[in-house]
Amino acid sequence: MGDPHLSLRALVLADERPYVPLARLLEREVDLVLCLGDLSRADLVALADARLPKLGVYGNHDEGDEFDGIGIEDVHLRRIELGGLCFGGFSGSHEYHEDRRFTWTQKKASKLLRKLGHVDVMLAHSPPLGINDDADDRAHIGLAGLREYLERERPAMFLHGHTYPPLPVERWGDTEVRHVRGHRFVTLPAPVASRTPA
């Protein structure tokens, strides 16, 4: 993974097949791949041979087996240290259909997220309530639990997909917010030790 004091560059994928083939995207200089859900196995299979760390969360349209055999580590409600950063995640979205595996009531999402401690980089399929969501579209309302998590834990970066914000919020308080649809290259924050002056 290179120098632990330098920022990592991530290829982040969410919601739809990138318009550039994954094999070509992986030729770019990246340190890891982050998946934010609603991507089919067919969309992800090119990652199987990539010798990079791969972390992800599932989206509201996923079945929960899309990462199998591809080497993507599911970080839903988990914390994982990588390259000097702590990553965590939350799968799914606001419950708008009862038959979806990765949908939550606002109350259930809040309860689950209270168990997740501080992370530097938070991966989520859904945005937080009131940030890059759509209050007029029941399927694209953000999760109150994610908003509470941002207020409580203040991660350095929050990455999400799921919605279609016309002008995405890029910062909320101390947290950099990145909306992803298709693919996006993101420079992650420097590890905490290298963010403090010597």
Regions found by a protein language model. Give the residues of each.
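Conserved catalytic scaffold of divalent metal-dependent phosphoesterases
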Residues: D15-V20, L55-G145
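N-terminal active-site segment of His-dependent metallophosphoesterases
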Residues: M1-D49, R114-H118
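Beta-strand-turn-beta hairpins that frame and shape the catalytic cleft
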Residues: M1-L11, R79-G89, V121, E170-V177, ...
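Short, acidic/turn-prone active-site loops that include or flank metal/cofactor-
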Residues: G37-R41, Y58-E63, R79-I80, G182-F185
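Short, well-ordered alpha-helix to beta-strand connector turns
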Residues: E29-V30, R51-P53, G71-I72, V119, ...
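Divalent metal-coordination and catalytic microenvironments
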Residues: D15, V33, D38, G59, ...
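Conserved beta-sheet core of the metallophosphoesterase superfamily
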Residues: A46-A48, P53-N60, D68, D133-T196
